[in-house]
Regions:
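Hydrophobic pocket-lining residues within nucleotide cofactor-binding pockets
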Residues: 130
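Rossmann-like AdoMet/SAM-dependent catalytic core
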Residues: 21, 195-277
Length: 277
């Protein structure tokens, strides 16, 4: 919804241009976005949208660099939700694998069918029930090749995981060959925030907990490298709000701006010598 609102309510040039963000939504959701421009300008909404569009742009910038510099030929989108990169993929020879819970993926595929959006042959859907199925085995079953350099986007997922669940997926990603990348977002722990940011985190935490998806996992830029090293991953870039503002939101007059320091984006590289079986 926030990516879609960005397409119609924010000034040009867009931070993240996604022509399918509105098309994939149900008609009532599209109409709600169009008729409530004032809602998108509220501080909380603008702040959340700012982070989400910067996050998406950053992940696709890392992918683009990987295609140029490391011959990336697979894109893996974990917790894909309504991500539309598989429909927009501009890179010949790049295959996109979308991973999500079976129920969520079924819902998305119905939306795609309702919108009469054609699915390219370069897109594969991989349903995974993480409580009962192996991510690695489901990927292999779908034709994923662990010997091919891959760009992974793992967005909007990590803060909701237990450390055990994070580790299980990170181990799978650490088996990818050198040249592969993993982009994910994470949040600083409450004690690392200013008093006003703690209040904001408390409010947001209450919202997501009420929705049944509480925040569970936090890192700091100091603790993350050691954690990733356990899975043959290393931090290539850790980007905070100030860096995202400078990179993507400078000189804008539409209210898109990141405040505080809670949200970070991590671009992780593979530190092993190649794919392991």
């Amino acid at each position: 919804m926030r990516r879609a609102a960005h397409q119609i309510h924010d000034e040009r040039p867009l931070v993240f241009d996604d022509p399918f963000a509105l098309k994939i939504l149900p008609a009532d959701a599209r109409e709600e976005i169009r008729r409530t421009p004032a809602a998108s300008r509220k501080p909380f909404s603008a702040a959340m949208r700012s982070f989400m569009v910067c996050r998406a742009r950053f992940a696709e910038d890392v992918l683009a660099a990987g295609v140029r510099e490391h011959a990336i030929r697979q894109a893996l989108i974990l917790g894909a939700g309504l991500d539309t990169f598989g429909l927009r993929n501009p890179y010949p020879g790049l295959h996109v694998f979308e991973v999500d819970h079976p129920a969520t993926q079924s819902w998305k595929r119905k939306l795609l069918a309702d919108a009469k959006l054609d699915l390219p042959e370069s897109l594969s859907f991989v349903p995974v029930d993480f409580e009962r199925q192996s991510l690695r085995q489901q990927l292999l079953h779908a034709g994923f090749d662990f010997s091919i350099p891959t760009a992974t986007a793992w967005l909007g997922v990590v803060p909701y995981l237990t450390l055990e669940a994070f580790a299980a997926t990170a181990r799978v990603l650490g088996r990818l060959p050198r040249g592969s990348s993993v982009v994910f977002d994470y949040s600083l722990p409450r004690e690392a925030l200013s008093p006003i940011e703690q209040l904001m985190l408390d409010s947001l935490s209450a919202r997501v907990a009420q929705a049944g998806e509480p925040f569970q996992l936090f890192f700091t830029p100091e603790s993350l490298p050691e954690e990733l090293s356990c899975y043959d991953l290393s931090v290539a870039e850790d980007v905070d709000s100030a860096a995202l503002n400078a990179r993507y939101l400078a000189s804008r007059s539409d209210g898109l701006h990141l405040r505080g320091r809670a949200g970070h984006l991590c671009h992780a590289a593979i530190s092993s010598n190649g794919a392991r079986q």
